[in-house]
Amino acid sequence: MNFIDEVKIYIKGGNGGNGCVSFHREKFIDRGGPDGGDGGRGGSVIFRSNHHLNTLVNYRYKQHFTAENGENGKGSNRSGKSGKSLVLDVPIGTQIFSEDGNILLHDFTEDDQSFEIIKGGSGGLGNSHFKTSVNQAPRKRTEGEIAEEMWIHLSLKLLSDVGLVGLPNAGKSTFLSVVTAAKPKIADYPFTTLVPHLGVVYVDDEEFVIADIPGLIEGAHQGHGLGDKFLKHIERCNVLIHLIDGSSNDVVVDYNTVRLELGSYSDHLEHKIEIICLNKCDVLTDEEIQEKINKLQQATNKEVFSISTYTNLGVNKIVKLALKIIKNQE
């Protein structure tokens, strides 16, 4: 399935039905009074979050959505049938913006939330409403209300507790596959991960969601590599796990490259709690591991953990630390 996280669509509510001009007809009654019914209300446009969805692909090819119009009123004071509302399902984490993207209209953060974005138009009044003492046979009625229409922007931000960051080939996808049941594509070349992946980590009868996004390279915020368009998917997380390839010639440069891209994208993202992990320690000697950890700790003034997603060295410790941070922020 294609991963689509940005779409622009047109939506319109249903118009109200027109009121009816009608007069009572009955045998032996020449001039019955007005009995025109009201028009039915138009259908509304409603968005609803659905945990079974994880992409906006349903809105990629069909972009125009209109609720049903209300029916016109009828004689014998019969009102027109109301139009059916249009319910559009979106993944949890979807945000609805104005067409220009500047105004946030709604943010879906839980399952089965509903948001009525456009109300259907009111039905018009039939001529029975306009009978007066001086006008016993009015031919006046009103038309149904024209419903609102608009273009909107849908943006999906995946909901996760932990975000994995690092350069391409830092081992993020392997980390995700080791600690969860997720099955991301893994190979020994850059940009194996082309779309975000989510997995659920189970720890001591508790769980949290972790997101792996495509690796960042220098200049990602300027569109280089796969760019920074996937960084929004870790904006909601509580903690970042920053994986660094231990086999790299300069782990400090690698670390700073990713930090620069995070800061260029968002101050909020740059200041999230971070767990720094020197990965692929299985291919290093103890002396090499300690040397690289010392360099990173001097450069960051933070604790650095040695792990190997190949042998599972230190991985469980990182998972438990992440869970502890998440619980402390609840």
Curated annotation (Swiss-Prot):
Pfam families: GTP1_OBG, MMR_HSR1. The keyword Transcription regulation does not apply. One of its GO terms (cellular component) is cytoplasm. Belongs to the TRAFAC class OBG-HflX-like GTPase superfamily. OBG GTPase family. It comes from the Bacteria. Monomer. It comes from Rickettsia akari (strain Hartford). This is GTPase Obg. Keywords: Cytoplasm, GTP-binding, Hydrolase, Magnesium, Metal-binding, Nucleotide-binding. PROSITE patterns: G_OBG, GTP1_OBG, OBG. Residues 160-327 form the OBG-type G domain. An essential GTPase which binds GTP, GDP and possibly (p)ppGpp with moderate affinity, with high nucleotide exchange rates and a fairly low GTP hydrolysis rate. Plays a role in control of the cell cycle, stress response, ribosome biogenesis and in those bacteria that undergo differentiation, in morphogenesis control.
